[in-house]
């Protein structure tokens, strides 16, 4: 312990108190983001530019995650868009927009939620811009995808999974003679 007149102070460097210099705080964040795969098709050009019918937009998305190592996970936001009319497809865009996420000292539940809810929420505006630019570059109006509530979808999926597990455990009676 330092005296009052001493310049040195007690920095509480006791390793048992966690002051060992190790980074043991919970952390999650992006390392980088990138287009992993992209396909853009305009299969009926140039005739498509003469069509008058409003296209139907079919949008599908999926979230994937791959562990790169113990602390890094690649999160993939997969978006497929097809604009079509009775005459055929105007355009087809398939995009896999990914990000490397660093996660350290988080519980499994928190890490899972970050990977499948928060990371896609952060990636989506960038993927949305890529889709808008691609449709514009195809010669059409930019397609501005509506925001997606990834946190709400994540919570809904957890509730659905819990209900399925509860139904599977006690809801069925065994077959056979009684």
Curated annotation (Swiss-Prot):
One of its GO terms (molecular function) is unfolded protein binding. The keyword Transcription does not apply. SUPFAM superfamilies: SecB-like (SSF54611). Homotetramer, a dimer of dimers. One homotetramer interacts with 1 SecA dimer. It comes from Erythrobacter litoralis (strain HTCC2594). The gene is secB. The lineage of its organism: Bacteria, Pseudomonadati, Pseudomonadota, Alphaproteobacteria, Sphingomonadales. Residues 1-25 are annotated as: Disordered. Pfam families: SecB. This is Protein-export protein SecB. One of its GO terms (cellular component) is cytoplasm. Coiled coil: none annotated. Belongs to the SecB family. One of the proteins required for the normal export of preproteins out of the cell cytoplasm. It is a molecular chaperone that binds to a subset of precursor proteins, maintaining them in a translocation-competent state. It also specifically binds to its receptor SecA. HAMAP family: SecB (MF_00821). Residues 1-13 have a biased composition (Acidic residues). It is found in: Cytoplasm. The keyword Transport applies.
């Amino acid at each position: 312990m330092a005296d009052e007149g001493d310049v040195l102070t007690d920095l509480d460097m006791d390793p048992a108190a966690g002051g060992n210099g190790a980074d043991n705080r919970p952390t999650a964040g992006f390392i980088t983001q990138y287009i992993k795969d992209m396909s853009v098709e305009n299969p009926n050009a140039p005739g498509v530019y003469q069509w008058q019918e409003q296209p139907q937009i079919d949008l599908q998305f999926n979230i994937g995650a791959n562990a790169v190592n113990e602390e890094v996970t690649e999160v993939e936001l997969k978006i497929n868009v097809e604009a079509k009319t009775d005459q055929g497809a105007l355009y087809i865009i398939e995009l896999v927009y990914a990000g490397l996420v660093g996660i350290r000292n988080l519980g499994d539940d928190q890490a899972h939620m970050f990977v499948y809810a928060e990371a896609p929420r952060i990636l989506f505006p960038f993927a949305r811009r890529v889709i808008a630019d691609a449709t514009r570059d195809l010669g059409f109006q930019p397609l501005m995808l509506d925001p997606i509530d990834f946190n709400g979808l994540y919570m809904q999926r957890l509730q659905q999974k819990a209900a399925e597990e509860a139904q599977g455990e006690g809801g069925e009676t065994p077959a056979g003679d009684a």
